[in-house]
């Protein structure tokens, strides 16, 4: 686990927002004013060697956050600083250099690998693009990486269809580590895998982090997965960041009603403890990002909402050292034994 005290952040995100046009087509994009607010004014930092978990329901904007940081899509507003440099002010050459230090692990191990390329070609592709080493050196590096992620280096000339889902994701992990990056954005890297395989991949990511000192932005919707690997965790709802803290505090004493409801739904493998836990049921479905609620975006489903919640946006403020929450009535809610070993 990384110590974030008195350290310079590797990645700093300030008031990041991303909107998409609601309609497609040339004229709609030019004349329509309707937009989907995917990410709205979020800020956080990631320090060298730490894992920062980003969790939320589907459609909350967590994957868009990762893609915007990587500059795969341009932000509507806000700034992203990587190693102290403003990404928006980087030239194309500097962007390419940044991507050498910042890599991506995709969610789908089937769609993220080119079926026409061998495993060796897939893993060596980042090195080829960035002109790293000779062909022989790249092949040797690929063999080393395959061995590190638990695959047989002799399978270097095989194709993706010859591997299982878990093995394919290991290939994706090997590719992400090929350039020895300082930060890897993991976009739900285990959600498409069987539960039995998820733990293996998570443990592999932790081992590689210990070995290479790489930082992770770990995006997921499964709270137990995020808890298993993260140093700090942020919770998103409908494009907004509602709570952020170290994982122990967040999972034991969440302050935001949305975080509390998510954690109350995490099952505990002890029937005696499970019987005593209070389940928080949310009413209705998340509102459309096309027309988000006024004030606090969570107030339409919040069990403790009052008049001010629909009128005024809550400040994202510190409720304890290192623990921030966006709620007018933030209070700790003790969670009994929410930890789950994968």
Which positions does each model-derived feature cover?
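Helix-to-loop junction immediately C-terminal to a conserved catalytic motif
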Residues: 70
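Conserved ABC ATPase "signature" region
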Residues: 86, 137-154, 260-264
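P-loop NTP-binding/switch modules centered on Walker-like glycine-rich loops
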Residues: 185, 189, 193, 197-275
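Charged, flexible cofactor/metal-binding loops and thiol motifs
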Residues: 7-9, 23-30, 246-342
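A short, proline-enriched helix->beta-strand linker immediately N-terminal to the Walker B motif
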Residues: 178-182
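Conserved ABC transporter NBD signature motif
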Residues: 78-86
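Conserved ABC ATPase signature
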Residues: 159-163, 167
């Amino acid at each position: 686990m990384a110590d974030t005290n008195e350290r310079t952040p590797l990645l700093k995100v300030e008031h990041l927002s991303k909107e998409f046009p609601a309609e497609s087509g040339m004229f709609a994009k030019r004349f329509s004013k309707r937009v989907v607010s995917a990410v709205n004014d979020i800020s956080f930092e990631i320090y060298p060697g730490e894992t920062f978990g980003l969790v939320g329901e589907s459609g909350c904007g967590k994957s868009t956050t990762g893609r915007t940081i990587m500059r795969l899509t341009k932000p509507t507003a806000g700034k992203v600083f990587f190693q102290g440099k403003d990404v928006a002010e980087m030239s194309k050459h500097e962007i390419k250099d940044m991507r050498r230090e910042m890599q991506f692990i995709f969610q789908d191990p089937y769609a993220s690998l080119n079926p026409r390329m061998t495993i060796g070609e897939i893993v060596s592709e980042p090195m080829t693009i960035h002109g790293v080493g000779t062909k022989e050196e790249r092949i040797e590096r690929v063999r080393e990486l395959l061995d590190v992620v638990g695959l047989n280096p002799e399978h270097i000339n095989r194709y993706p269809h010859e591997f299982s889902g878990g093995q394919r994701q290991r290939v994706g992990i090997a590719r992400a580590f090929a350039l020895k990056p300082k930060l890897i954005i993991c976009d739900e890297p285990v959600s498409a895998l069987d539960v039995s395989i998820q733990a293996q991949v998570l443990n592999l990511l932790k081992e590689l982090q210990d070995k290479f000192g790489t930082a992770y932005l770990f995006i997921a919707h499964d709270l137990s997965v995020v808890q298993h690997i993260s140093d700090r965790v942020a919770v998103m709802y409908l494009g907004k960041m509602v709570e952020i803290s170290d994982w122990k505090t967040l999972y034991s004493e969440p302050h935001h009603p949305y975080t509390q409801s998510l954690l109350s739904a995490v099952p505990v493998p002890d029937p005696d403890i499970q019987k005593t836990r209070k389940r928080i049921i949310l009413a209705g479905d998340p509102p459309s990002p096309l027309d988000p609620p006024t004030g606090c975006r969570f107030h339409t489903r919040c069990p403790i909402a009052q008049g001010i919640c629909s009128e005024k946006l809550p400040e994202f403020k510190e409720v304890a050292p290192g623990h921030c929450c966006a709620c007018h009535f933030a209070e700790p809610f003790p969670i009994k034994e929410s930890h789950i070993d994968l």
